[in-house]
From Swiss-Prot:
This is Microtubule-associated protein Jupiter. Belongs to the MAP Jupiter family. Binds to all microtubule populations. It is found in: Nucleus; Cytoplasm; Cytoplasm, Cytoskeleton; Cytoplasm, Cytoskeleton, Spindle. Residues 123-132 have a biased composition (Polar residues). It comes from the Eukaryota. It comes from Drosophila mojavensis. The modification Phosphoserine is found at S30, S135, S146. One of its GO terms (biological process) is positive regulation of microtubule polymerization. The keyword Nucleus applies. Residues 123-163, 182-203 are annotated as: Disordered. GO terms for cellular component: cytosol; microtubule; microtubule associated complex; nucleus; spindle. One of its GO terms (molecular function) is microtubule binding.
């Protein structure tokens, strides 16, 4: 068992000394827990959704004139920030000058021609198709170059839609049928899932 002398410093040296930490009320020094009314001061809340199109920059007067960083000094207001247009009084009052209205391009419209619709088929003029000459096909893929060559040579195919399969002849010879091995009939596996699954919209 430890002696009294080993633990006497715990309480004997702290006797008579007040604690230096002062507890404060959760509401601060002026909180009143008994419910008396206190003077209400309105809070200054900045409206972040307010528009400042027609007003001058009010934050510029409150910010410092010199901004320091990485051994450089920038004077705010000397040059406009990147990405912002300089604002003068004429453009603030009357807006920007009127620009000619140009028709927008329909980016969702497909450029792939289907069937014999003359509106969707590209124009063929002087051996050029869509800005490409008939002899240049090295940069395009094999599928697009073969369709371009068909269009250039005047062999526009109108048998059907290659995506959905509508309009093709039942006994067409567009594809090469594989030879049957060992003289047996070919077994078609109906349980196969197409690439991309059935939700791809192609099947």
């Amino acid at each position: 068992m430890a002696t009294y002398a080993a633990f006497k410093h715990v309480e004997l040296y702290n006797v008579g000394k007040a604690k230096k930490r002062v507890l404060r009320a959760p509401g601060g020094v002026s909180s009143d827990i008994f419910g008396s009314e206190q003077p209400q001061t309105p809070r200054n809340v900045k409206n972040l959704m307010a528009s400042n199109i027609f007003s001058a920059d009010t934050d510029a007067a409150q910010k410092n004139n010199v901004r320091q960083g990485a051994h450089r000094f920038y004077y705010i207001g000397e040059t406009p920030r990147r990405g912002q247009k300089p604002v003068d009084s004429y453009s603030r009052l009357f807006g920007e000058p009127a620009r000619p209205i140009t028709p927008s391009k329909n980016h969702m419209k497909s450029n792939i021609p289907f069937g014999q619709n003359p509106n969707t088929a590209p124009l063929i003029s002087k051996g050029n198709y869509n800005g490409k000459s008939g002899s240049v096909s090295s940069a395009s893929s094999s599928v697009s170059s073969s369709t371009e060559n068909l269009k250039i040579n005047g062999g526009v195919r109108s048998e059907g839609n290659p995506v959905t399969g509508e309009g093709y002849k039942a006994g067409g010879t567009d594809y090469i049928q594989p030879a049957h091995l060992n003289g047996g009939s070919q077994v078609i596996n109906k349980n196969r899932v197409p690439p991309g699954g059935y939700s791809s919209g192609l099947w």
